[in-house]
Amino acid sequence: MRKIITTTICALLFSFGLYAQQDAMFTKYMFNSLVYNPAYAGSKDHMAIGLLHRTQWWGIDGAPTTQSITAHTPLRNDRVGVGLNLINDVIGPTHSIQANISYAYRIPIGKSKLAIGVQGGVNSWRADWTKLSLEQQVDAAYDDPSPSFILPNFGGGIYFYNDRFYMGLGVPHLIEYDLRKKGLDGGEVETPIWAKQYRHYFFSTGAAIPLKGEMLVFKPSILIKNVGLLSGINKDEAYQNLGAPTEFDIDLSLMFYQAFWIGASFRSAFEAFDDTSSFDSVDLWASYYLQNGLRIGAAYDYTLTKLQGPAQGSFEVMLGYEFNYKTKQLVTPRYF
């Protein structure tokens, strides 16, 4: 049973060209905003560093595991922020490493700020198809047993925020790549799907609503993810076969005394092309800010899909550090 499930995951996720959500997924996305939107760089007004590990569908061989490292800070010019994000993503026989440098310029609008950000970097992707047990031993799609790519990357985003509200749109990968490898005869391999890296769009918004002063703050947020929205595919049949659903994460959380944070979220998806929807998971998470500027957190996803039986949920652990850039004195963390 486990081997069958693993093979199914390979078929659905391992093919880098599959027209689906290709970017890494995180339950604690609100602590990893730089990954989705380069305009977030420097928005905390002090340097912030974060490390996050995710194990998805724990208990299934070949299931995704992801690590991210982010760091961002404002410069002496308060309007400029810079950042760095690294992502290591392993799904069965495939391995992807991304590195991006971000630059954001902030424009004051009353008590709010509008940031415009760009990023540039590189994505290294490779696979080892010999780890798969193929139903068809002669498959043109796997003529190259160890394909690899080095892909330059450029992204952009906008981010509007103040002390109580934020809204942003990020496109971390603006360039789309045709990833079809040449066959043994020199021609392009015929596959039932288009081997392509697609453009992803991430829309996020949230608020911080005091319920009892700063002692108790309610913080709702949402992240909407779409892939291939403007890819220029005109064939309805191709859309139906290859179109990834629009996914959304809805999160509701409470923060106590600006230190202890608990939340619950719901992840689902809507397929615009055949009017269907699906429930992916319900999630619980907690985070704590220590007095020395350290932040720790963890999350658990309860799967609602057909993997509910063999998988034992998904897990995330997070470690962060924040400090005041100008005075080097540790400060109370901000809400966003």
Language model: regions and residue ranges:
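Positively charged n-region of N-terminal signal peptides that target proteins for export
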Residues: 1-4, 109-110
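Generic early N-terminus positional signal peaking at residue ~5-7
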Residues: 5-6, 25
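Residue-level detector of intrinsically disordered/flexible regions characterized by low predicted structural confidence
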Residues: 4-5, 221
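Absolute protein N-terminus
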Residues: 1, 20-21
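Bacterial N-terminal signal peptides
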Residues: 7-17
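Subset of outer-membrane beta-barrel
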Residues: 21-336
